[in-house]
């Protein structure tokens, strides 16, 4: 690590015009659990890192405290500068020490945080950095109720920041210190202001330069001004004529840079952003730059089977690839924000994003989501402000999630939700707030947008009952700006001989999930009452609290290898670039009944279905959904679907065959089971 820092120092000396330097702190960490009492047997790890990587459902999951140690040689030449250490994600509570001195704590596992360590450093010497990390549940650190795994660890990158005494602040809510506010956006002109946060070593003024560079590299705005430093943020107005507006179809990105210095630049920070307007109305739906965009969104959680929660760029690229193949144009960061890399890519790809704050209730009846204490409420407010400040400049982020699926019993949570909603608007007036609700009452009237979490027909009633609910919503609450989200679990290893069979806590067949999505898609797709449709979830995710250690509501398995039938349903409905033809239930190749019926998804027109040499009659059931009546088959039969150039097929064994034994995981006797 010493050699690594020293090498970067040489590069910094050569680049004398760039005073700020940023050094990765991902290498050279020693990791050991607090229960081990000493670091004698510490493991050498590289960030991102988590101590929980078992997502296979064995139930082995640690909620504990661990230590991360690193040694840094800090050159004597840096003694006239300032040093900051930044962590992009530590789950969930971090206490930071330098050379044995306490630096500070961060309570919240999804946002970045920065500490200044200048006065703790021994310049020209080795310095010991210690981060004590806990992923234990706390009643004053949100979320206090969730079924997703909180894996623990320093699960995102870390870095050392070197600046002059006066600099753009790395300390403002873990952000870059620059918020690019858009006050007025049109095809003719963008007007806004750059809000700049500064730190100073005693100077009372400095010269700031604001430059804005267009997507083609041309400078479209520049302003230089002498600024008084008084502890308040500095605001520099700007305007851009004939802007290229950011949209899903044209994700144009501008570069906004702020530099400090007169003849010599002593600090410089640049951020990317895009200029666009966002409006949502009951009649006009969700519009970007005045054009309505029906949102086809998926909920995205925070892990996979290989990396656990310590996701890296290739993990995000793979997930975005599948999301784009599905045809979704939006994603929801469930419960908490993802890494900056994901939102950078959404900016570039034109993907719309809903970012949740971690105020969430799971479906476990014993959970408490809201503790009516000052500590809890302050933590929720702090995390929300950090989320907004750190993601403010991303044009892809179009709404802030305030809460998800909270109950209205017990302490009245609505006054606190009102405070959170007001705080979001105070920090960012340009974006709407949103909530996901499965409750009645005043809780649904707090945020600008409301997304109804609906599951009628999953355990009670029938899936067609959702149309009754929809009609009641339109009759009584059409003035609300409503979206809808839905989903249900389906494990590819669980097979049912009827899609109507009710799911159980430890048995949720894929066929049931498929049926649920088919009926909801039939009844709700392209319904103008809703500004957006959100599918829960894009991928299965780790949940040690559930049977098999996995929440199986994804359209794709947690290892990303198997796409469930429902994936192809939405691909047929949403992906207009790549046609779809898919026969459902192909994993059930052994059929014991001679009477068989088939479902086919096609976006390439009505398919032809062959059973051996025989053509089966196909009828259109709903948009992109086709079905056959039950037909008599026996023996080994190849089923082939044809639609234009597309082909899909499956070979079945039909008749008196042995049913495969149902594979079950270890029986659980603890933890109440959720309702979905």
Predicted features along the sequence, with ranges:
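Active-site-adjacent substrate/metal-binding segments within catalytic domains
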Residues: 48-74, 78-87, 91-98, 104-107, ...
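Aromatic-rich peripheral "rim/lid" segments of glycoside hydrolase catalytic domains that contact
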Residues: 536-603, 613, 644-646, 650-675
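Substrate-binding/catalytic cleft of secreted carbohydrate-active enzymes
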Residues: 320-322, 330-562, 566, 570, ...
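Accessory carbohydrate-binding/adhesion or oligomerization-edge regions at the termini
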Residues: 19-56, 132, 138, 159-160, ...
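Beta-strand-rich binding/interaction modules
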Residues: 189-226, 234, 595-616, 636-642
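Short strand-edge motifs at loop-to-beta-strand transitions and within beta-strands
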Residues: 68-70, 111-115, 232-238, 624-627
